[in-house]
């Protein structure tokens, strides 16, 4: 009895909505008879549009459901080279193992470029190395702390036998990153604080280019200690013991609080942090 009452209420509501729609459109949409209801030409015309809209709505609902279950999706990341190698690749490997249908789009940026891309909504978030300068609505979270070393090749290995001052290295050729990177900015400040001029004899576009230049004795240069361990153990490069301590660096997650994150982006960040 209760179910019959609910059906009667529902049918009355549907009839009321149909009548209201006809009054609003000022035309007859339904032909009512003892045999049931049929559509008028105007009713068929409206139905074609409504059916298409309903189909698109159903497709949208299914896409949102799949996004929620991470059956597909897209995550765009701006990453500096060192951040990519120090932490991001390992985290993304784990993420892809669990969510293989989510597409990843990686942009290899310097830290300033990655931050600018985030400001411009070109990426969902950025993984970069310090130093970094941001303002709201951007926010950062430290993921990893590390230090760099001053390294040399076999030609200069005698310099690595005892602590040495940066002042004693002024006449040696330096390999460094080009201007416009956070690494170059950091070392410009480091040398300035120690009252030493810093003008690299060879400028590299990426950190990956710095290491082989050091190995082949084109100059001495700074390199992330975690990434240098293997080549140090192989005897290809040597770490100098500087009397003036190098600044500590961090790998940071930078997000933009002014934009909403998709389920895929939120899940990717969970894996990274």
Regions found by a protein language model. Give the residues of each.
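A short LG(V/I)-centered, amphipathic sequence patch enriched
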Residues: 20-39
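Secondary-structure junction motif
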Residues: 158, 173-194, 261-265, 269
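Central regulatory/effector-binding core of bacterial HTH transcription factors
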Residues: 72-135, 204
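Alpha-helical linker/hinge and terminal dimerization helices associated
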Residues: 24-25, 46-68
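Single conserved hydrophobic/aromatic residue that forms the stacking wall/gate
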Residues: 1-5, 9
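Flexible hinge/capping segments at coil-to-helix
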Residues: 137-174
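Hydrophobic hinge/microswitch elements
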Residues: 110-123, 129, 182-240
């Amino acid at each position: 009895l209760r179910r019959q009452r609910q059906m009667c209420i529902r049918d009355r509501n549907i009839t009321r909505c149909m009548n209201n729609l006809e009054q609003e459109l000022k035309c007859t949409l339904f032909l009512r008879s003892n045999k049931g209801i049929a559509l008028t030409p105007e009713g068929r015309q409206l139905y074609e549009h409504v059916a298409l809209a309903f189909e698109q709505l159903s497709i949208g609902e299914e896409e949102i459901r799949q996004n929620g279950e991470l059956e597909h999706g897209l995550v765009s990341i701006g990453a500096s080279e060192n951040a990519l190698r120090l932490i991001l690749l390992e985290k993304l490997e784990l993420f892809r193992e669990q969510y293989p249908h989510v597409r990843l789009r990686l942009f290899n940026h310097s830290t300033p470029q990655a931050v600018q891309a985030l400001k411009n909504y070109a990426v969902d978030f950025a993984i970069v190395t310090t130093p970094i300068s941001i303002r709201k609505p951007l926010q950062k979270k430290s993921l990893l702390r590390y230090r760099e070393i001053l390294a040399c090749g076999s030609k200069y290995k005698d310099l690595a036998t005892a602590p040495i001052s940066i002042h004693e290295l002024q006449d040696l050729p330096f390999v460094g990153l080009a201007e416009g990177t956070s690494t170059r900015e950091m070392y410009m400040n480091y040398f300035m604080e120690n009252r030493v001029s810093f003008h690299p004899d060879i400028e590299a576009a990426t950190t990956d280019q710095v290491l082989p230049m050091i190995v082949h004795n084109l100059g001495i240069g700074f390199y992330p200690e975690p990434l240098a361990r293997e080549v140090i153990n192989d005897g290809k490069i040597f770490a100098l013991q500087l009397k003036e301590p190098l600044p500590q660096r961090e790998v940071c997650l930078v997000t933009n609080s002014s934009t909403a994150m998709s389920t895929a982006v939120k899940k990717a960040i969970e894996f990274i942090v």
